[in-house]
Curated annotation (Swiss-Prot):
Keywords linked to the UniProt accession: Cell membrane, Endosome, GTP-binding, Lipoprotein, Magnesium, Membrane, Metal-binding, Nucleotide-binding, Palmitate, Phosphoprotein
Species this protein is from: Mus musculus (Mouse)
UniProt entry tagged with the keyword Manganese: no
GO cellular component: endosome membrane; plasma membrane
Annotated GTP binding sites: 38-45, 85-89, 143-146
UniProt protein name: Rho-related GTP-binding protein RhoV
Region (Disordered): 1-27
Reported cofactor(s): Mg(2+)
Residue numbers with lipid attached (S-palmitoyl cysteine): C234
InterPro entries assigned to the protein according to its UniProt record, in alphabetical order: P-loop_NTPase, Small_GTP-bd, Small_GTPase, Small_GTPase_Rho
Length: 236
């Protein structure tokens, strides 16, 4: 009998003694919860939509509470980040606080062309965060950076008797004062520094989770050691 020809798509048969190749199991997906807080109309929703959907909202719509989910790869491992878009209005204070527990990282957002939103970082948002979640890392984020040099915006600020845009050194100084992981300015419209903001949030959350796990493991070892010492002491 002539030998059977093998097509290009058909692999050669394995010898009977050769075990089938094992498939490598995919690494488990790490979950991260990221909550955005800040005054209303500073652009929190726009940041999330621009990052997850590569789009920009046509008009402002106040948000009560929305969640978005996107998967990214960090050093080849899958990471699922849940983005929580919260309302900045006082009417939603109670609802907003419900999403703070178990948060891995916070983005404290203010508009660089709304000085009052910058002031509220220390007067409202940071105290609110620390009341419900004292340990999670916080990133200070200046939004609407594309408007910093916008002539119409500058005229409106001047005519309204308000201060000019928040200076970058002042924002950087606040980040150091409140011990934020970093200060970043970005624009949802132009997407400038947008990826850097969420990349920094993801890495900060991963590092925070690793520190918590290390502390938990160390605590378990100490507890186990004490139990063994007590048993040994009683036996003797």
């Amino acid at each position: 009998m002539p030998p059977r020809e093998l097509s290009e798509a058909e692999p050669p048969p394995l010898p009977a003694s050769t075990p089938p190749p094992r498939r490598r199991s995919a690494p488990p997906e790490l979950g991260i919860k990221c909550v955005l807080v800040g005054d209303g109309a500073v652009g929190k929703s726009s940041l999330i939509v621009s990052y997850t959907c590569n789009g920009y909202p046509a008009r402002y719509r106040p948000t009560a509470l929305d969640t978005f989910s996107v998967q990214v790869l960090v050093d080849g491992a899958p990471v699922r980040i849940e983005l929580w878009d919260t309302a900045g209005q006082e009417d939603f204070d109670r609802l907003r606080s419900l999403c703070y527990p178990d948060t891995d990282v916070f983005l404290a957002c203010f508009s660089v062309v709304q000085p009052s939103s910058f002031q509220n970082i220390t007067e409202k948002w940071l105290p609110e965060i620390r009341t419900h979640n004292p340990q999670a890392p916080v990133l200070l984020v200046g939004t609407q950076a594309d408007l910093r040099d916008d002539v119409n915006v500058l005229i409106q600020l001047d005519q309204g008797g308000r201060e000019g845009p928040v200076p970058q050194p002042q924002a950087q100084g606040l980040a150091e004062k409140i011990r934020a992981c970093c200060y970043l300015e970005c624009s949802a419209l132009t997407q400038k520094n947008l990826k850097e903001v969420f990349d920094s949030a993801i890495l900060s959350a991963i590092e925070h989770k690793a520190r918590l796990e290390k502390k938990l493991n160390a605590k378990g070892v100490r507890t186990l050691s004490r139990c063994r010492w007590k048993k040994f002491f009683c036996f003797v």
